[in-house]
């Protein structure tokens, strides 16, 4: 998992509420556990005109030339709802997204994003609407400053928050397993103090 500090990237606006994990990565593509090979299937049913994924839908926003190379996804409310699947953030990340911004996320999806180093940012509905209004007129670029918990766009700035563990995990590139392994000496010392079962 890579450390996250600051990131400046092009925004792709997906102005759709309640995008569920099956829309993000349909179930037929969940047949492996390695974290590779999912980006090509991201938003498959909207992104492609055919079942095989060989003919792109030119009307789907991430296929539009002006959004090629975008690394920040601006989304509608309740993003990532539906069934729990780690493959959804894997697909987003492998496609090239480093940040997802929405007014709300499904809780499990939000946690899965943190676990893989994909930064989910919650802004207010009014702030999200403001960004959506900016995005169609020009290529919108945002800078995300994780240590200071701020998103900037020119003169505009938007604060966001994470809990202490989420902040630590992303800034240090450490997931929950890695965090536990970093505390191994403390865990061993505690266990040595505990009386043995008799």
Curated annotation (Swiss-Prot):
Tell me any Pfam family this protein matches.
Aconitase_C
* UniProt keyword Lyase, yes or no: yes
Which keywords does the record carry? Answer: Amino-acid biosynthesis, Branched-chain amino acid biosynthesis, Leucine biosynthesis, Lyase
* GO CC terms, sorted: 3-isopropylmalate dehydratase complex
Q: How does it assemble?
A: Heterodimer of LeuC and LeuD.
Xref: HAMAP family: LeuD_type1
Q: What is this protein called?
A: 3-isopropylmalate dehydratase small subunit
The protein's organism comes out as: Colwellia psychrerythraea (strain 34H / ATCC BAA-681)
């Amino acid at each position: 998992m890579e450390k996250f500090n600051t990131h400046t990237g092009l925004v792709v606006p997906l102005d759709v509420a309640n995008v569920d994990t099956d829309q993000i990565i349909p179930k037929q593509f969940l047949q492996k556990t390695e974290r590779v090979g999912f980006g090509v299937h991201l938003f498959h049913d909207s992104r492609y005109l055919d079942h095989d994924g060989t003919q792109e839908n030119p009307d789907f926003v991430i296929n539009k030339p002006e959004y090629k190379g975008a690394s920040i996804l601006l989304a509608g409310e309740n993003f990532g709802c539906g069934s729990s699947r780690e493959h959804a953030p894997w697909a987003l990340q492998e496609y090239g997204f480093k940040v997802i911004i929405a007014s709300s996320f499904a809780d499990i999806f939000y946690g899965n994003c943190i676990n893989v180093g994909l930064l989910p940012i919650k802004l207010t509905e009014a702030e999200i609407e403001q960004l959506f209004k900016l995005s169609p007129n020009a290529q919108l670029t945002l800078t995300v400053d994780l240590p200071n918990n701020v998103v900037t766009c020119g003169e505009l700035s938007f604060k966001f928050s994470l809990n202490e563990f989420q902040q630590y995990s992303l800034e240090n590139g450490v997931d929950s397993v890695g965090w536990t392994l970093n505390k191994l000496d403390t865990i061993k010392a505690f266990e040595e103090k505990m009386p043995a079962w008799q």
